[in-house]
């Protein structure tokens, strides 16, 4: 309410916005935030922010209708990790891009082979795939949704069956994939080193989505209030947050060794500063893994790095949190637990989404 009334702080973080009932993109459309490109253009500081120093794929996620409303600070790739010994026999010698169409087939092959095997360790992970399907069909900025297409209904049916077929005793499950999709860099290489140590090969897959593309989430971003009288000062703060030293220290590029018990959180997020990004990967290549006993091989170091380097699609973390929990959360649970049928679910989904978008 304070933000919408033109009050509040000069600088707002994405973490603060994720706690609000109004979506971040709705606030963007209502003119709450400044166009940061205008602030940069109007700045007379000779050392002002140079966007070329940062990852353009990630920075461009802050652009809506040609205007830059936020600057990403850190990000995480969405990665599902497995190994050749676990997964290759289900992949027909091809590494698939996971979509809503093929994930059910892959899961079924795994379940049929061994009743204790599953794609993920928790049934909650299958629910998250279902929620992602819904989110991909809701544009909070344009305030539009599409729940009427045959493709959407087909995916709803398929992912509901995927969820139902994996409601089992989680204590005995042997997961084929790391489940949450978010792996900090050192932990990713630690797991890959462990796979190498077993004379196995890593397999990296995307988290399932409509087009099967590799994706990432922006974990921290900074907005500037449109009503701020201190826009240049706010820009200086963004420059500081994106500086090589701050980004390298925060993201773990300067750690001396990787010890998960003492270095927890180092490298949890990836920097958008290009120099810091390079330093982080250089450090990840240099340190030892598996309790400080093993280096990562050059081939698998580059395998993971190339995957992260080539991610083109990013979105703000937490963008749909309120919508998923407070707006549609209970009807999703009812549908997945067979309390309501598909027609009633989609009818209610449309009604609630429309009300939320028009508020």
Placement of each model-derived feature along the sequence:
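Extracytoplasmic/periplasmic substrate-recognition and gating elements
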Residues: 195-272, 312
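Extracytoplasmic/periplasmic solute-binding protein
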Residues: 61-82, 101-148, 171-183
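Short, solvent-exposed loop/beta-turn-alpha elements that line the ligand-binding surface or hinge
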Residues: 34-52, 95-98, 135-154, 209-212, ...
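Loop/turn elements at helix/coil->beta-strand transitions in domains of secreted/extracellular proteins
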Residues: 6-10, 34, 67-68, 112-117, ...
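Hinge/lid segment of periplasmic solute-binding proteins
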Residues: 15-79, 199-207
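C-terminal capping/gating helix-and-loop segments adjacent to ligand/active sites or protein-protein/ligand interfaces
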Residues: 278-358
